[in-house]
Amino acid sequence: MNIFLVEDSQPVRERLAAMLGAIPGATVTGHADHAEPAIREILATHPDVVLLDLGLAGGTSGFDVLRAVRPQAPEIDFYMLSNFAADPYRQLAGRLGARGFFDKSREFERVREVIVQRAAAHAAAPV
């Protein structure tokens, strides 16, 4: 299962990549810290899962990525990950098609749990 990370903090991105890369069947295939290159790379590579930070470099957001990519690639599972986890952000993410929204400060390990489940389902799916 291929995962693309959209995260502007290098330490967080590295932590996510290490955590997710240790999951059997999961491979982090790319990353971006800004919406524009993220959109371009996601549409070019069609990963199975995209983890999106809300606030990105250059004043862009994960919502920009979700709005641009989701209609063109509805098969990709998007999950938001942010320190800004208030209900309005969670609700907007859901309306835009994100499958989940995680608070970085309290739900970081939950990301791993969800990806483990997703990788197991992906491995069991017929080709």
Q: PLM features: what roles do these ranges have?
A:
Residues 31-49:
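Acidic, metal-coordinating helix/loop segments flanking the phosphotransfer/catalytic sites
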